[in-house]
A protein has these predicted regions:
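Mid-to-C-terminal alpha-helical segments outside catalytic/metal-binding sites
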Residues: 1-16, 21-50, 220-222, 231-268
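Histidine-centered divalent metal-coordination motifs
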Residues: 10-17, 116, 145, 172
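Conserved, mostly hydrophobic/aromatic
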Residues: 13, 43, 74, 104, ...
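Divalent metal-dependent hydrolysis catalytic cores, especially in the metallo-beta-lactamase
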Residues: 26, 34-61, 83-89, 111-112, ...
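Alpha-helical scaffolding within the catalytic cores
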Residues: 31-41, 69-74, 97-100, 152-157, ...
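Active-site-proximal loop/turn and secondary-structure-junction residues that shape catalytic pockets
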Residues: 57-58, 92, 117-119, 148-150, ...
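Active-site gating/metal-coordination segments in enzymes
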Residues: 64-143, 147, 205
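Catalytic pocket-lining loop regions of alpha/beta-barrel enzymes
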Residues: 111, 122-224
């Protein structure tokens, strides 16, 4: 095992559960499905020691998910599954998820907040004030889907600048509703406090030079390893970083050290 493959990686963007989208075929939905044990098995096979998940039950089907029920399931499942931590999902259209998040963020298995404006069907700009106020009061880490039309990266920038207590992870480097692969990186360049990061969980990661370009623009310190497991292959996402055209010092930051610095003792 080479020196990079020997690093026990931390995946900051995973899921578990049943994938359900009405516009997809049954075989497609089946292929995107994986329970907690399967997520851990795939991670362990490529030396990913910890995966931070949100439950698909809290996100899907699109516009119909009950985030509160999904959060309750995650608290139970993750507590009994070594190798996992979880985010609590807030859906601002379901006010009860704020109170639920307040309680769950005090629990050792819950390390942050997950937002998904696309699956829950709301423009982030209409709810960002309350979401960021809530997260700032708790000095919470927030992982959000980006950059489709309800979750434009540029719409997060003023709030990240206004609330430096919030550490924000923009998911899916290279994702863009308009085909532009630069949204996450450009948003980070506009942020003033060093409190915004991006993860590698996009399917766009397979593009040659995308991850390398992102590092050249914002530094490896702002890039976190994510897989979007079980939707995408953990092994493929791990290999993309292991074999990136980057110095080993940068790979180590992306795979592990940045997450350790960001989440700290919450990962214990």
């Amino acid at each position: 095992m080479n020196s990079i493959a020997s690093i026990s990686a931390i995946d900051v963007h995973g899921h578990y559960g049943v994938y359900i989208q009405a516009d997809k075929t049954p075989i497609y939905n089946q292929m995107m499905t994986g329970d907690a044990d399967e997520v851990v098995r795939r991670a362990a096979a490529v030396n990913v020691g910890l995966t931070i998940v949100s439950p698909l039950l809290a996100l899907l089907p699109r516009f119909k998910a009950n985030a509160a029920v999904g959060n309750e399931e995650a608290a139970r499942i993750v507590a009994q599954t070594p190798g996992l931590k979880h985010y609590v999902v807030i859906d601002p259209k379901r006010p009860e998820t704020y109170a639920q998040a307040d309680e769950m963020l005090r629990q050792p298995q819950c390390v942050g907040i997950k937002l998904h404006p696309e699956e829950h069907g709301y423009p982030i700009r209409e709810h960002a004030a309350l979401l960021f106020e809530f997260a700032a009061a708790r000095k919470a880490i927030v992982l959000t889907h980006s950059s489709e039309q309800n979750s434009l990266c540029e719409d997060f920038v003023p709030w990240a600048n206004r609330f430096p207590e919030v550490r924000l992870i923009l998911a899916h480097i290279g994702c863009g509703w308009d085909g532009d692969v630069t949204h996450q990186v450009r948003a980070i360049q506009k942020c003033q406090h060093g409190n915004v990061f991006a993860d590698t969980s996009s399917a766009r990661s397979i593009m040659p030079n995308l991850i390398e370009w992102a590092v050249s623009q914002i530094g490896a310190e702002r890039v976190l390893f994510g897989t979007d497991t079980p939707l995408y292959s953990t092994a493929m996402q791990r290999a993309r970083i292991d074999h990136a055209d980057l110095p080993d010092t940068d790979k180590r930051l992306i795979l592990r050290d940045n997450a350790v610095r960001l989440f700290g003792s919450q990962l214990d």
